[in-house]
Structure formats: C-alpha cells, structure tokens
C-alpha cells in the first residue's frame, strides 16, 4: 500500500525494498490486489531487481536492518512496516545502515515520538525516528482536534468498527492472548481492544486522559469507521459542529480531514487519500453538549 501510494507522488522515489519474499512474489503481489485492484503500471523482475514503470528497485532479504547498506542506494527515509522493529533501539539499525530518517508505520513500543497529520505535525523538530501512529489514531485525531479547538471536549468514548486484518483467523483457531481474536473473521463481529483513543492524548496532550475506546472487528476487507461520542464544554448545535468541521476540511486540514454529506457507505472510501472523512449525515446529537460523530 505504501508503494502504491508513493507511485502517485512526484516527490517520492522508491529505491529499495527489504522483505523476506523473493522478487518474483513481490511483483505478483504488487500487480494483483484483491482489495485495491490491479496495479496501474508495468511490473517485472530483472536480475533480481524489481522493475516498476521502467525503474529498477533494489531488492534484499535481510533479517537484520543493520546489514541493509541503505547508503549504497541513497535512502533518505525508511518506511519501517514489518511491525517488528518498533522501538528506537531496533529501528535505529536503519540509521546505522545509512538511512537518514525512519518512519514507523504503526505505534511504537517505547517513547518514540508520534506525529499525526492534522494533529501535531507542526511540532516535528527533525527527529530521525518517528511513529506515524495507527490508522485509527490518524482517523480520530484530526476530528478530535477540530472539536476540541472549537468547542472543548470534556470527555469522550470512541468505538472503531474495524475491517479485518491479516492477523485474524479465516476460521476458528488458537489465539492464546486474545481468545475472541481467534474466532473466524468472516463469521463474527469481534469485540477487541484498541489503544487508538488513548494515543490521541500523545499527539494532542490537551486531550490526555479524556478519551478511551474499543473496537469491533467486522467481516469487511477494507475501510473502518470511527464513532466518537463526546461531551462538549461549549454548547453547540449539530449544524454548528458540521460547519466547523467543513471549514477545517477546506482550510488548515485540507487533504487530511475530508467532509461529505452524501449517502456513502464504507466501500466508497476504498483508496481514499484523506486520513479521516467526516460523515455529516451519520452523526447525531442528544443535546447541545452531547454528540456522536462519525
């Protein structure tokens, strides 16, 4: 997914990929995607390299990032997407290998600084290893910031209705740490934990301790929903809330926070470039201080 997204940007050039898969299988997985469709471009393998749209990309299969010799191919930024090297100590092996920066594609397991577009991106001060948080935090944080900046959040609960992930089981199987998580993904709505709401407190310190949440894993292949229910400090009608979110989506958060009043469903957001899209028709208000936002 990172690779496909990068192909749509002129300011990103993929020069190397490290994976334990061989190049032929990488090419196959890039060409064909059950969720996002066929790759729009040419993909082939030559002399052990992946060649995409005529550009040669170095392929390696190193288990230890320290051996990757990123400097030999002029790597500026490594997208650390294995889910294994999630601490400063382990991710720093990429720096040792010659990379200048490392972005963890999920939450870190230590105090590695976390940055989210639409939340605290402007506080980035050049750190060489950062986390981009989780997909749920990226969806929640921009919306929470707009609401808190305009109306103040006293407290809130978040529920994410989350598409299935690769760690789930196609049929019931062993899952010793999470018994429910071992049940068949295609057959069940599975309650699960998530640290996404609490993580918002790391990127928006003013909300630290004010939000928590949970997840339901559901049998859909892609696109998840965040349901944010909050109590407001400043009373506001639902129309006023919509107006504030729409203004943000057209202003400072354009390209990060989207806004729609269409009668949309989840598949309409397959391939969406915004990290969060507010569904104006889906939310409801109990009164001017208690509201559910989707």
Curated annotation (Swiss-Prot):
Catalyzed chemical reaction(s): D-glyceraldehyde 3-phosphate + phosphate + NAD(+) = (2R)-3-phospho-glyceroyl phosphate + NADH + H(+)
Keywords: Acetylation, Cytoplasm, Glycolysis, NAD, Nucleotide-binding, Oxidoreductase
Entry annotated with the keyword Cell membrane: no
GO molecular function, one term: NAD binding
GO biological process, one term: glycolytic process
Record-listed D-glyceraldehyde 3-phosphate binding positions: 134-136, 165, 194-195, 217
Main EC class the enzyme belongs to: oxidoreductase
Known EC number: 1.2.1.12
Record-marked site positions (Activates thiol group during catalysis): 162
In-chain residues carrying the UniProt-annotated modification N6-acetyllysine: 177, 234
Pfam families: Gp_dh_C, Gp_dh_N
Listed Gene3D superfamilies: Dihydrodipicolinate Reductase, domain 2, NAD(P)-binding Rossmann-like Domain
Active site residues according to the UniProt entry: 135 (nucleophile)
Annotated PANTHER family: GLYCERALDEHYDE 3-PHOSPHATE DEHYDROGENASE, GLYCERALDEHYDE-3-PHOSPHATE DEHYDROGENASE-RELATED
UniProt subunit comment: Homotetramer.
Function: Catalyzes the oxidative phosphorylation of glyceraldehyde 3-phosphate (G3P) to 1,3-bisphosphoglycerate (BPG) using the cofactor NAD. The first reaction step involves the formation of a hemiacetal intermediate between G3P and a cysteine residue, and this hemiacetal intermediate is then oxidized to a thioester, with concomitant reduction of NAD to NADH. The reduced NADH is then exchanged with the second NAD, and the thioester is attacked by a nucleophilic inorganic phosphate to produce BPG.
Listed name of the protein: Glyceraldehyde-3-phosphate dehydrogenase
Organism name: Pseudescherichia vulneris
């Amino acid at each position: 997914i990172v690779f496909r997204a990068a192909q749509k940007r002129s300011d990103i050039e993929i020069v190397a990929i490290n994976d334990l898969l061989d190049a032929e299988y990488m090419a196959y997985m890039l060409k064909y995607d059950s969720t996002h469709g066929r790759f729009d471009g040419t993909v082939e393998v030559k002399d052990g390299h992946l060649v995409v749209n005529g550009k040669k990309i170095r392929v390696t299969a190193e288990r230890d990032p320290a051996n990757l010799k990123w400097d030999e191919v002029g790597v500026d930024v490594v997208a650390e997407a294995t889910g294994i090297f999630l601490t400063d100590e382990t991710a720093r092996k990429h720096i040792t290998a010659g990379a200048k920066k490392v972005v963890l594609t999920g939450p870190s397991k230590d105090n590695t600084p976390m940055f989210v577009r639409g939340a605290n991106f402007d506080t980035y001060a050049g750190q060489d290893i950062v986390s981009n948080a989780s997909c749920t935090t990226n969806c929640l944080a921009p919306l929470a910031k707009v609401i808190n900046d305009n109306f103040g959040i006293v407290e809130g609960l978040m529920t994410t209705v989350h598409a299935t992930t690769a760690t789930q089981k196609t049929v019931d199987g062993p899952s010793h740490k999470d018994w429910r998580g071992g049940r068949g993904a295609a057959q069940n709505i599975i309650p699960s934990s998530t640290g996404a709401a609490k993580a918002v407190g790391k990127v928006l310190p003013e909300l630290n301790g004010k939000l928590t949440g949970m997840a339901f894993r559901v049998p859909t292949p892609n696109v998840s929903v965040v349901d944010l229910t909050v109590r407001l400090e400043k009373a506001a009608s639902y129309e006023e809330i919509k107006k504030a979110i729409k203004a943000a989506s057209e202003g400072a958060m354009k390209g990060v926070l989207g806004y729609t009043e269409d009668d949309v469903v989840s598949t309409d957001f397959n391939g969406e470039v915004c990290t969060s899209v507010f569904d104006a028709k889906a939310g409801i208000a109990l009164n001017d201080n208690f509201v559910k936002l989707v």
